[in-house]
Amino acid sequence: MLLPRRGLRTLPSLCLYILVLVWVVACEPEGTPTPLPAPEESRWSLVPSSVKELVGPLLTRTRERWQWFWGPGALQGFVQTYYDDHLRDLGPRAQAWLTSSRDRLLNTAQGLCPRLLCGDKDQD
């Protein structure tokens, strides 16, 4: 590390800073810090338990009402309908798309190719 021109003058203060930092870290007591004392009971400390009492039954009722949605019957019906609507004829559609894409690409390539290199289309 190259020190700037003023580096030689700041080197003693940098060393002092490092020594003080090492001393502070070394003098820290080892182990876990003591926990903070419990806060006094106030109205605000009762808020989480009150919210849990109000929201808990609501969540339970909602979970019970929507249980049918997460069951295997609803999901199986959705997957079957999706397959019938979108995936049943995917193989033939994909094959037709690949064939038409290949034909379009060949026609475009032959249209760009000069006659001297590719020959006449009528000779094929």
UniProtKB/Swiss-Prot annotation:
Signal peptide (UniProt feature, chain positions): 1-27
GO BP field: lipid transport; positive regulation of triglyceride storage; triglyceride homeostasis
A UniProt-annotated Pfam family: APOC4
GO cellular component, one term: very-low-density lipoprotein particle
Primary residence: secreted
InterPro entries in the cross-refs: APOC4
Keyword Transport annotated: yes
Post-translational modification summary for this protein: Glycosylated; contains sialic acid. Present in up to five sialylated isoforms.
Protein name as it appears in the record: Apolipoprotein C-IV
